[in-house]
């Protein structure tokens, strides 16, 4: 059995093949704004799979994928078999990506656990001591800080967030990078400390997403950086639902 795992985020949509036991080397990516049946036919021409599992946070793309996929397919939701309970008053509000992260984290790192996913938004998702999804925190992503300043000021430029050489910037770009990276690490540390205090127990902390490695370098409380936690959550969910 070969699965096609589809992780549709706001910025990019990933397509990864897997067996029931592990991810396979074949990986494809399409910018989310470009996803269409025609584009997928082009990028994934010749890709063979038996069934697909999807986590999508973009309704337009979800519809495109429903029309494009002809094999058995499961869209991850709170109604899926997850191997993780849901202790949340409005489960249909939970993003499919957050559910996939919870599934992957519980399987690979145990529980309690916090998954920090650095994307367009940063999400903190909490899996409690009883292996239940409890909720979490949503904040603007790292890139959003620089984008906001560029859009709403006359003279500040766009920046590419990267490790500052020092805190005291000696140019506008250096000062913005320092504010973004060090400020963001402060945000992450504060939220993690408060989550741990509310849980009353020390959880494993797993970081994933595009900015995970950069931010984790300065946040000792992050135990693991795992770029594939969402995909492995999808792989596990495929085995439970297909």
From Swiss-Prot:
InterPro entries according to UniProt: ATPase_NBD, Type_III_PanK
Keyword Lipid metabolism attributed: no
Binding annotation for ATP: 7-14, 120
Enzyme class: transferase
Disulfide bonds: none
Protein residues bound to K(+): 117
This protein's pathway: Cofactor biosynthesis; coenzyme A biosynthesis; CoA from (R)-pantothenate: step 1/5
One record GO biological process: coenzyme A biosynthetic process
Active site per the UniProt annotation: 97
EC numbers: 2.7.1.33
Alphabetized UniProt keyword annotations: ATP-binding, Coenzyme A biosynthesis, Cytoplasm, Kinase, Metal-binding, Nucleotide-binding, Potassium, Transferase
Subunit structure, as described in the record: Homodimer.
Name under which the protein is recorded: Type III pantothenate kinase
Source organism: Akkermansia muciniphila (strain ATCC BAA-835 / DSM 22959 / JCM 33894 / BCRC 81048 / CCUG 64013 / CIP 107961 / Muc)
Upper lineage: Bacteria, Pseudomonadati, Verrucomicrobiota, Verrucomicrobiia, Verrucomicrobiales
